[in-house]
């Protein structure tokens, strides 16, 4: 019996009184266990992901302490309206269901974080604008053709994912009200009908080596992200030579940021820069037809500047508590990543996920910017909108500079680098 099935058995036996967290993932549930209501006064986090649920009970608001609910990878076709009446609920995750309808009353004004990635949502209700405290909104991989006009009222919104939807026009995906939001800092919109042709042109126009799969020998798995696996490898070109590289093989599935094909187009278009993790070539002839890239192997002396946001921090990276920088180190990291961002903008790209956890640094404070999963091509024929998008990226740079300043022994060292 798995740990979660043991938890379910204990729940049904009444042995979890006072529990605050309940993990019932992959328990084969097709109905909401009514015994959960026995924890109504204490339960703050409930995870029902990976089951066969289609509905939640109408009396869900009886869970008066519930703040976080995950129901990803179930069979929901409608976002349950009862969510909107839960008195403390502020984080809702329903990724990878079959949700086509979001009722107006399903969105609580208390929402801080809403995840609806990889569903079938064609429209969001105007009540979205009442979510004045909403900071993070994940809508990639749906069927949206427009955003509600009220999106401009989401004054706390910092991160939004709109990639891989059905937006035919850029003004429907990126309305002026959205781009004018004062705190919007991380934005992704690749893989929509209005920009897929631009992505294809970029792939076709960018000169890049085609590296045969049989020239590569995979080594150890270095890491796994939402879009793929990264391996160490040896590259032995047919003309001779042997050198270490990294190989990224894309999974080919929807991620929280968008489609792997969009990420690959952005990686290639990013070209070469001293502070950007570069691409050596595109893999050809993979036996299963997988798409992949060959990249330079990053020396082990490089490490992530920070960890990704937590459930509590929402949109802010989590740094090691003891991490400190000299003024020179902080300045070098900020200057290098600023230059990397300016390079991407010059290449016609918005990074969209400019975060410390996507930056590698070594002991000499040399920084490398990576992870193009949320990158999008700038609309070169729409200068005002393009400039607005660059400003959003630069707002993320300001956040990074603030975070470095907080951990720097000479905070004034970074003043000149602020956008």
Provide a role label for each language-model segment.
Residues 288-302:
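Conserved short submotifs of the Hanks-type protein kinase catalytic core
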């Amino acid at each position: 019996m798995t740990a979660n099935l043991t938890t379910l058995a204990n729940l049904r036996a009444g042995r979890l009184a006072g529990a605050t967290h309940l993990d019932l993932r992959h328990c084969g549930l097709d109905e909401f266990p009514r015994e959960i209501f026995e924890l109504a006064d204490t339960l703050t986090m409930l995870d029902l992901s990976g089951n066969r649920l289609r509905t939640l009970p109408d009396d869900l608001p009886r869970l008066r302490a519930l703040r976080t609910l995950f129901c990803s990878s179930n069979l929901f076709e409608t976002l349950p309206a009862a969510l909107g009446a839960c008195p403390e609920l502020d984080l809702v995750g329903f990724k990878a269901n079959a949700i086509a309808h979001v009722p107006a009353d399903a969105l609580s004004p208390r929402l801080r974080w809403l995840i609806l990635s990889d569903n079938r949502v064609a429209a969001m209700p105007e009540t979205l604008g009442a979510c004045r405290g909403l900071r993070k909104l994940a809508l990639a991989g749906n069927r949206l053709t427009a955003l509600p006009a009220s999106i401009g009222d989401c004054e706390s919104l910092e991160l939004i994912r709109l990639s891989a939807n059905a937006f035919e026009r850029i003004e429907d995906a990126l309305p002026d009200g959205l781009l004018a939001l004062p705190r919007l800092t991380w934005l992704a919109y690749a893989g929509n009908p209005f920009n897929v042709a631009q992505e294809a042109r970029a792939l076709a126009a960018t000169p890049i080596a085609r590296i045969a799969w049989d020239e590569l020998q995979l080594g150890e798995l270095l890491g796994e992200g939402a879009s793929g696996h990264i391996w160490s490898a040896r590259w032995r070109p047919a003309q001779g030579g042997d050198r270490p590289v990294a190989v990224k093989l894309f999974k080919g599935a929807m991620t929280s940021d968008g489609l792997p094909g969009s990420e690959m187009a952005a990686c290639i278009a990013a070209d070469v820069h001293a502070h950007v993790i570069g691409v050596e070539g595109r893999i050809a002839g993979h036996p299963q037809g997988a798409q992949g890239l060959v990249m330079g192997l990053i020396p082990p002396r490089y490490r992530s500047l920070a960890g990704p946001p937590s459930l509590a921090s929402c949109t802010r990276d989590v740094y090691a508590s003891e991490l400190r920088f000299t003024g020179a180190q902080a300045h070098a990291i900020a200057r290098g990543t600023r230059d990397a961002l300016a390079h991407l903008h010059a290449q016609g790209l918005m990074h969209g996920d400019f975060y410390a956890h996507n930056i590698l640094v070594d002991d000499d404070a040399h920084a490398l910017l990576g992870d193009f999963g949320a990158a999008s091509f700038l609309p070169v024929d729409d200068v005002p909108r393009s400039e607005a998008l660059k400003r959003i990226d630069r707002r993320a740079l300001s956040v990074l500079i603030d975070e470095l300043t907080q951990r720097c022994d000479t905070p004034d060292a970074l003043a000149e680098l602020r956008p």
